[in-house]
Amino acid sequence: MKVMKFGGTSVGSVNSILSVKRIVESASAGEPVIVVVSALGGITDKLINTSKMAATGDSAYEGEFREIVYRHVEMIKEVVPAGEGQVALQRQIGELLNELKDIFQGIYLIKDLSPKTSDTIVSYGERLSSIIVAELIKDAKWFDSRTFIKTEKKHNKHTIDADLTNKLVKETFSSIPKVALVPGFISSDKTTGEVTNLGRGGSDYTAAIIAAALNADSLEIWTDVDGFMTADPRVISTAYTISELSYVEATELCNFGAKVVYPPTIYPVYHKNIPIIIKNTFNPDGVGTVIKQEVSNPHSKAIKGISSINDTSLITVQGLGMVGVIGVNYRIFKALAKNGISVFLVSQASSENSTSIGVRNADADLACEVLNEEFAKEIEMGEISPILAERNLATVAIVGENMKHTPGIAGKLFGTLGRNGINVIACAQGASETNISFVVDSKSLRKSLNVIHDSFFLSEYQVLNLFICGIGTVGGSLVAVSYTHLTLPTIR
């Protein structure tokens, strides 16, 4: 048995959703499959925007809602054959859309949008799409993920209750049909039963939770790319698909900006040693990327991929009053954690007089506020400088488990950056040597990615196109020297 997850782009158009039908029906011919689907491409954003418009009293929300209705109604007409099945599906989808219409109207009238109502609204995206796909695929049976994906509230956030969820998943799928169809992303509170969700990208997480609970043979994530790439192909034209990654490498790449897999997805299947296979719905015969415990070629390239986070702010806590003082870093990270601020990079001077942390731009102001409050006494006494954020930065990470076996990687990396005039503002490397990350000015990001990719992934030999105008003393000597170094074919 395997679990297959299809993202929004995979169910976003008539052609793509028909491709999903072919892929699933082919897979289910040999074994039972559980299929997890996202909302139709772009619908989640449209639901959120429509909610916000209604909450501000903007009557144009009605036009946005009509577009949501149109997308689903037209999809049914295009992919489901005319007849009783189509009529029944239109009725079922119509009921859900009417519920959604009433919710939007209520928000518009009271001009208020609570988090609970927002969670309810975005759940309709996956509920609508999964019901349509279930009708489209032969022998598919629909299951409501709200009945078995359970969350609890911790630190004002909804998190999975793993024990209860695993128990309910096993009970729900004690007998697996040929095709089980499940809406991704959505869940419910274990105490109140209220609709919750697993966050953007949560459909990947839904699929991983189910795969782990049922000890699936594999988890397939079908998306609109061929797998993990050596770098962002939109920036690096020579980037290519990585055939294999370890769980650790995939996690590092995801944490530093690669959006192929939602980061929390990896742990549940890693714990059960279930391989994750990334495939392209639009190129189903492509090789894709396999994520597993151990790669089959341990002597492959030292680094597997390059990832980046463009919206970086660097916050530095510094001052001579920090030197030799125990607990400064503890206070930094405790204050940030208490306010829900995630830190993805830490760099500390060996003299202990400064610690720099990388956060998302959206968290920078709050991070400065809470740290200035935490160290208010030290700042007033001049022991620590006022804490400010350095903005318009980008973080780049090179990732690969083989780096720990290869000397000179850091030297090659920073040498490449230096030769190309790129200034490194901060850097960090864990003791595991799986990741080297550094911060640069955001204007240097594209150049950084290109020169690093050329250095680590292209041929050891660079091709130079040399043009000589005239063969005088200098030109003639250059031609003669070049000729003596040519490797000529052997003539038999």
Model regions: which residues?
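Nucleotide/pyrophosphate-binding catalytic subdomain
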Residues: 1-262, 266
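Conserved small/polar residues in nucleotide/adenosyl-binding loops
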Residues: 484-491
